[in-house]
A protein has these predicted regions:
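Non-heme Fe(II)/2-oxoglutarate
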Residues: 2-96
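Catalytic core of non-heme Fe(II) oxygenases with the double-stranded beta-helix
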Residues: 81-207
Length: 207
């Protein structure tokens, strides 16, 4: 199954990735792949995690995630081996995922709900702070204590890189950078719910 759209800038994107830059991948996946990613959580009868305002399904080794990961690593050799993936589906008007870091060398966050479903176009995006957790922090601090992260960011005075929501847009970045989902604002109706698909590549922060 072919999952990636044709593009001519893979070599340039891989160079950016190797240099540590945040890479934006618009029009990343083909229509069939997007349909599968979106509908398998829209129609899910069971979820793995329930949070305040959103739910998650884990994709540790499902065939579709593996195909996407393998194709991406062929195009972007700078990517480390695939670790895991998950999907989040949000209620229509809620807070986004709070500030945290992930134990990966790269995160790929892809948005799979069409733009026509968005209510407030100023919301639903992603904020990334080019700041790594202090070495003495534990997982419960860098992945479960957003207030402590906020204090660190305030102390360092670092500003976020902000990325607007766009259907079929992928954001590829150092997963250990602190990041958060912007507040969510989508139109009413189950089919309009904001769905994100996240892939983790490589490992860091945890031994």
């Amino acid at each position: 199954m072919k999952v990636l759209r044709n593009r001519k800038d893979w070599k340039n994107l891989n160079t950016k990735l190797k240099s540590g830059r945040i890479v934006v991948l618009d029009n990343l996946l083909n229509d069939d792949c997007l349909f599968l990613l979106r509908n398998r959580i829209l129609n899910a009868t069971k979820v793995n995690d329930v949070y305040k305002g959103y739910k998650g399904i884990d994709h540790w080794s499902d065939s579709l995630s593996i195909v996407i990961a393998n194709d991406l690593r062929k195009k972007l050799p700078a990517l480390d081996p695939f670790v895991r993936a998950w999907s989040f589906i949000y209620e229509h008007n809620v807070d986004g995922v709070p500030l945290h870091a992930d134990p990966s060398t790269h995160n790929l966050n892809i948005w799979v709900t069409p733009d026509k479903c968005v209510k407030d176009k100023r919301k639903n995006g992603l904020e990334i702070y080019k700041l790594l957790p202090p070495r003495n922090w534990t997982r419960s601090e860098w992945n479960g204590n957003s207030l402590k992260v906020q204090k660190l960011i305030k102390k360092t005075k670092i500003k976020p890189s902000k990325y607007k929501y766009k259907y079929n847009r992928g954001i590829l970045f150092n997963g250990a950078y602190f990041h958060r989902t912007a507040d969510v604002s989508m139109k009413e109706g189950h089919e309009n719910k904001r769905i994100s698909y996240t892939m983790l590549f490589g490992r860091q922060l945890e031994k």
